[in-house]
């Protein structure tokens, strides 16, 4: 009977750990997507700096895979999101430096999240092994009682 309670406890903890791991995996995916978006913005600004034309033509996305043609009127400055719905105008150089910092922050958050996920996965494996041992004990005691 004690083995049943212990097995229930281990199974419950395993479910909790699995749920936490799933949340961290989703977090990791969101962090990676956000980092990729910031990286794309940085690369776009770097490429803009290489263009010699003072007012290069661009395509402006308007949704549903549709675009309007436009011209950049100020290719020396960019308006960059700084979070919480705020954006500031920065020179391209400053914007790129700022985006580099954001990418480093994402790298660190991804690293920490991956470490936490690895720990949870290790704990889940330990719990699965423990549950299997309890089940084996139950099977052995059942055979002995016969």
From Swiss-Prot:
Annotated Pfam families: Prefoldin
Predominant subcellular localization, coarse grouping: cytoplasm
Keywords carried by this UniProt record: Chaperone, Cytoplasm
A cellular-component GO term for this protein: cytoplasm
UniProt GO MF annotations: unfolded protein binding
Classification via InterPro entries: PFD_alpha_archaea, Prefoldin, Prefoldin_subunit_alpha
HAMAP family hit by this protein: PfdA
Family: Belongs to the prefoldin subunit alpha family.
Record's protein name: Prefoldin subunit alpha
